[in-house]
């Protein structure tokens, strides 16, 4: 079968572009970690510096010679970008635990309602105000509204987990509550995002179609949850090469097959990760856990940084950005989620500082916020300005959450263990 290949100079240009993306993402990511900030913020910033905000603005010929050296280089790089998204969601699915602590059920329910349902409902009147500035070429109001509302309420499990781990509070009641709520929240929001992309793709809105897509998407997760409850019976030791090969075959095949049924790659990869955990387990010290950790180390040192850097390189904070509209959206998103959480946790007997901690922590958008922006932009649901606003909102909210929690810990180290 004759397949078209890249010329040697095109391969070299692609490798150079990847190396520069990795170098920039690694350098800025490491810098952010040194100042106790989320690494993802640095990796995106590394991409921003390469793009129209700085280097491409002042050295267009040089940067074009690297990232646009031949026709179609952007498409080649986009493959690595998509693989970063796939592995990010695959690993997120593997690390997802849908288990509610019965002793803490009231707090979990109140935080979920205050951080998800209330802010999304309160944001509905603002959709029309921003639509004229933020809507994409698809022009579908329902898809845009769903993305807008998700952007208001989304929370990041990976970023929050990393912050908790670095602070040494990963197994506290506060951390467990936040992670449980974030898991349920992200599941609901992924379902809504999948519905939004499906509606945008079909170009028309029918209530029956919306219900069908939402039902099918939710049904897939229910099926995955059902399988996970019984899959442990079939666990057995398998060689590492078989483990990885079967996992990758399953991952790529399911992503391809489900796309024909209107399920986007992001959600499909999440489901596969969840299923793999069900069959192989995630017990600490087990062979499966060690293998997934090694896969995570590789993915988060190559594909994921490239993904975040390519997200950043698209941003142009000089031409495609309004500071006023960014401030308005950020204040709306941070304020509604924070106040909503604070309002509902006021019905508990938690300490005042703990209530504020929940309100600020649930605002950390991190990786899921980036995924939301890139998926919505790729389906033309949002334009470049809103894409930029969502990315910057994600970065700033994650920084605020991280620094706030460390500030509180310095004042009272026991605040997270005693709810």
Regions from the PLM with identified roles:
Residues 7-20, 72-89, 139-155, 208-220, ...:
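Structural signature of hydrophobic alpha-helical transmembrane segments
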Residues 104-110, 170-185, 205-210, 285-290, ...:
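Membrane-interface alpha-helices at helix entry/exit sites of multi-pass transporters
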Residues 21-30, 48, 52, 56-57, ...:
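Transmembrane alpha-helical segments of multi-pass membrane transport proteins and ion-pumping complexes
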Residues 50-103, 230-239, 246-328:
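Membrane-interface junctions of multi-pass transporters
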Residues 37-46, 103-118, 173-180, 235-246, ...:
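Cytoplasmic-side transmembrane-helix entry/capping segments in multi-pass membrane proteins
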Residues 55-59, 120-128, 186-197, 251-265, ...:
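Hydrophobic alpha-helical transmembrane segments in multi-pass integral membrane proteins
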Residues 27-34, 98-167, 311-413:
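Transmembrane alpha-helices that form the ion-translocation and gating core
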Residues 2-7, 60-72, 130-139, 198-210, ...:
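Membrane-interface helix termini and inter-helical loops of multi-pass transporters
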């Amino acid at each position: 079968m004759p397949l078209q290949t890249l010329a040697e100079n095109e391969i070299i240009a692609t490798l150079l572009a990847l190396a520069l993306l990795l170098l920039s993402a690694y350098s800025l990511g490491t810098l952010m970690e040194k100042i106790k900030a989320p690494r993802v913020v640095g990796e995106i910033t590394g991409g921003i510096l390469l793009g129209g905000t700085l280097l491409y603005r002042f050295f267009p010929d040089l940067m074009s010679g690297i990232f646009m050296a031949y026709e179609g280089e952007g498409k080649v790089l986009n493959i690595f970008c998509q693989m970063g998204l796939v592995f990010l969601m695959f690993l997120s699915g593997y690390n997802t635990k849908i288990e509610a602590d019965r002793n803490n059920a009231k707090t979990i329910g109140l935080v979920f309602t205050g951080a998800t349902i209330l802010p999304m409902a309160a944001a509905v009147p603002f959709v029309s105000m921003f639509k004229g500035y933020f809507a994409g070429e698809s022009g579908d109001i329902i898809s845009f509204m769903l993305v807008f509302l998700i952007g208001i309420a989304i929370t990041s499990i990976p970023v929050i987990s990393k912050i908790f781990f670095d602070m040494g509070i990963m197994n506290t009641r506060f951390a467990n509550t936040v992670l449980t709520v974030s898991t349920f929240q992200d599941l609901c929001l992924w379902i809504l995002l999948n519905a939004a992309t499906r509606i945008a793709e079909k170009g028309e809105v029918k209530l029956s179609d919306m219900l069908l897509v939402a039902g099918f998407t939710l049904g897939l997760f229910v099926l995955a949850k059902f399988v996970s409850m019984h899959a442990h019976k079939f666990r057995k030791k398998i060689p590492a090469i078989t483990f990885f090969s079967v996992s990758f075959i399953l991952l790529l095949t399911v992503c391809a097959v489900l796309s024909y049924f209107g399920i986007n790659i992001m959600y499909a990869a999440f489901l596969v990760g969840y299923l793999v955990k069900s069959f192989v387990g995630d017990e600490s010290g087990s062979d499966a856990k060690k293998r997934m950790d090694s896969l995570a180390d590789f993915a988060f040192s190559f594909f994921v940084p490239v993904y975040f850097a390519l997200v950043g390189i698209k941003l142009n904070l000089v031409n495609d950005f309004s500071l006023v509209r960014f401030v308005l959206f950020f204040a709306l998103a941070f304020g509604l989620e924070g106040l909503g959480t604070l309002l509902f946790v006021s019905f508990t007997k938690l300490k005042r500082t703990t209530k504020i901690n929940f309100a600020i922590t649930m605002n950390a958008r991190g990786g899921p916020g980036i995924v939301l922006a890139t998926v919505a932009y790729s389906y033309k649901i949002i334009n470049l300005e809103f894409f930029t606003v969502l990315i910057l909102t994600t970065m700033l909210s994650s920084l605020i959450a991280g620094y706030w929690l460390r500030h509180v810990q310095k004042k009272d180290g026991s605040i997270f263990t005693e709810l």
